[in-house]
Every structure is written in C-alpha cells, then in structure tokens.
Amino acid sequence: MQAEPKKSQAEQRAVAEPVSEPVSLVGEEYEVEVGPVAHGGHCIARTSEGQVLFVRHTLPGERVVARVTEGEEGARFLRADAVEILDPSKDRIEAPCPFAGPGRCGGCDWQHAKPGAQRRLKGEVVAEQLQRLAGLTPEEAGWDGTVMPAEGDKLPAGQVPSWRTRVQFAVDADGRAGLRRHRSHEIEPIDHCMIAAEGVSELGIERRDWPGMATVEAIAATGSQDRQVILTPRPGARLPIVELDRPVSVMRVGEKDGGVHRVHGRPFVRERADDRTYRVGSGGFWQVHPKAADTLVTAVMQGLLPRKGDMALDLYCGVGLFAGALADRVGDQGAVLGIESGKRAVEDARHNLAAFDRVRIEQGKVESVLPRTGIDEVDLIVLDPPRAGAGRKTVQHLSTLGARRIAYVACDPAALARDLGYFQDGGYRVRTLRVFDLFPMTAHVECVAILEPAAKGL
C-alpha cells in the first residue's frame, strides 16, 4: 500500500485552523462626506478606514449617514444607501414618487435631484468614462458637455416626465403588481409608476391582481393606439382572464421554450418614427422613450450626411429603424445591408423595409456575418450594439472598410468609450458626440458618436 505524501506545515495549519467566513457589514452605518458621481446611479464616499462606498440616494458634496446594503470586511468596495441627510446639496429635492427611496423601488436613481442636476451628473459620468477608457476630453470628442433632454421633458423640479412606453411589472406571491427593489428580487407593490407613459398607465396593470404570474409587461406603442401585455406565468400556473381599462393584445412567455406566444390579438405593435411605421414583434426591441427613435435618427443622419448612391451598413439593426432612414436617403443607386442576430427582429425588419429593393437584411452575429459578405469597402456605417458594446474584434474589422463616416449609438458610456478607443487604434477620430437624456430619473443616457478617418481631421 502506497503511503500518503506528508502534508506541509501550511497544509497542516489549514486543517487545524478552519477558514473563518468574511464578516458581513450589511446594516453598518457610516457618517461620510460624499464625493463625485459614479457610473451606475450612485456617488463615491469612503469610510474612516478608507474603504470605498458606492452610495445611492445622495448627491456630490453632501454629508450623510450611509447604511451598508452589500459587502463585507476587506471587500474592495461596499454598497450603501444614504438613510439620513445631514448636510443636503442645493440640488436636492423631495422625491416626487412616493415609492422612491432607500430600500424601495429600484426603477429610478435620481428622483431626489433637480432635473438639471440629473443631466449634469450624467454628463460628468460620460466625461469620466471618455477620459478613463478612451483618453478623450469632451473637447477632443467634439462634445460641449451638454446632456440634452428629449422634446417636452424639460420640466420644473418636482414634475416627472411620463416617458416609459414599456414597463415590466413584477408580481408578488399575493398577485400584486409592483417593481423590483434595487439589486433585489424583492418586489415593491405600487399603485402607479410616475415615469410610465400615459398609454401604459391607462391599462391599470397595478390596479389588478395577477395570480400565478411572475411578470406582466405592458407596452404602449408610439404613433398608434396599439397596446400589448406580455404575461410570464409561474411554473404550472394558468393564465388569468385579462380585463384591463383599454383594449389590448395578450401574449405569454412559454414555460419550456421561453418564447413569446400569442394568446389573442396582434403578435406585434406598430411604432412610428421618421415618417415610417415599423412592426415590432412581441418581445422585440424598440426605444422606450416615445421621442427616442426620432431623436436618434435625426442625430445619426445629421452626423452621417448620406449621399445618393452610398453603400451603408446598419449593424445590430433590430427591426430596421436606421436601415429605413438610410434607404430613404441613399436613393435607388445606393444600397443598405442590415445585420441582426434576432430571428423575429429580422422577420420584422424585412417586413418593414420590403418596399426597398436596395435593402438587404441578414441574420446572425455581426462578427460572424460581416466577414462572410465579402464586403471590403463601404461609405457609411451605423452600429447600435447591445449594452456590452461591439468589442475589439468587430471594431477592428469596421476600421478596415474605409467608411467616410461612422455613427455609433450607445446606451452605455463605458462600452462606448472602450470601443471609441479601439476605433482610434484603427485610424478613426471622434468628430462629434451628442448625449441625450432619454431615460429621465434614471442613471442611463443615450449617446451618438460620429467618427471619421483621423487623417481627414488633420
């Protein structure tokens, strides 16, 4: 019988001395001076021991009592809520929403800040990400630092724009609809969401019981009266009879396949943008703010300045919003190729743009499909990637196609900044950057960066 190897002294100590569990700091309170805003809807502070705190429900320059919500001794950082404001900022207001605040609804980040201050804070986040990840100052990115509100959203302090045309309500064990608390599966029951668009509020989702449902998503299309509800049942649950305050089509998420299936009514809604109607299938992507699609199309087309006869790419094209705008502008002698990974979105894009012989829509991942097309030269590129961004490999490929201008649409300034750095490595420079507040009361923004070959800017 072979003898076991002798344990080292360190191994013997590890057996003799069981490893202690990290000590949770949840619930601990610290009086702190609040520093700058950070990406994600919180501000940075430090404990007296120097540990970093990411604090929600506060503003830069305030002195607050911060209660830890996540983290342990020795962790790189802690998460916390400001539960007492000792020295308030001049930008602080009382949150208009009765469901906002520490431990409450997680749908909004800046209910406690004046609207102008919200936009200023978002601008500071974008500027910090540009500098840190792309090495660009606002001036070098062609941006004046302004975060522009959507048309109609510039309201006095205390008033909240009702902008969210898609709201997914979570349902608790008692069948009550609400919204999830921040970074939690716990549900805050509500009777009204202030940022929900009028068409969503009119349905009365929050005023009904939803037994057996996990989520209820409400959609109110822009430019049509289409209303839709998507139900996600809990395992084994039966669908309730849907009786709402307005006519709706009803879909359900399949328990086995996760697909969205028709119960009754149209399996899509009709959205309107750039003087065109777009069919968007159940579960498909469309901008949530009613002014967002037109705002972004205008910004992209003003930046690209398409010409008759141009060859253009629309990458991550969804249901064809930018491809349609490009097709109108490049004319019969031009061509547009859209690439989208979602099967249903591709079907919708082909339907929406069927009148254009010059538009082709391909299904698949951009990094896989684009090399297979054999395209080695284009005039214009639009890319509107998911939150994670396009990534180094895709940006490197796009940088070889000789595009006269590139429009990058992004909902995450960190991913945008990383990819702008890759474009710079590939010989492009940022000509202009525009930042839009299309998600009021939240930490999110939408950016449109226009790039051109660096040699052109010399």
UniProtKB/Swiss-Prot annotation:
Coiled-coil stretches noted in the UniProt entry, renumbered to this chain: none
Region annotation Disordered: where it falls in the sequence: 1-20
EC number of this enzyme: 2.1.1.-
Listed GO MF terms: 4 iron, 4 sulfur cluster binding; metal ion binding; rRNA (uridine-C5-)-methyltransferase activity
Top-level taxon of the source organism: Bacteria
SUPFAM superfamilies reported for this sequence: Nucleic acid-binding proteins, S-adenosyl-L-methionine-dependent methyltransferases
UniProt KW S-adenosyl-L-methionine keyword: yes
Biased composition (Basic and acidic residues): 1-10
Alphabetical list of Gene3D superfamilies matching this protein: 2.40.50.1070, Nucleic acid-binding proteins (2.40.50.140), Vaccinia Virus protein VP39 (3.40.50.150)
Residues annotated for [4Fe-4S] cluster binding in this entry: 97, 105, 108, 193
UniProt keyword Lipoprotein present: no
Domain TRAM: 23-84
Keyword annotations: 4Fe-4S, Iron, Iron-sulfur, Metal-binding, Methyltransferase, S-adenosyl-L-methionine, Transferase
Active-site residues from the entry: 411 (nucleophile)
Gene Ontology BP terms: rRNA base methylation
Residues holding S-adenosyl-L-methionine: 287, 316, 340, 384
Stated family: Belongs to the class I-like SAM-binding methyltransferase superfamily. RNA M5U methyltransferase family.
The protein's name: Uncharacterized RNA methyltransferase SCO5901
Natural source organism: Streptomyces coelicolor (strain ATCC BAA-471 / A3(2) / M145)
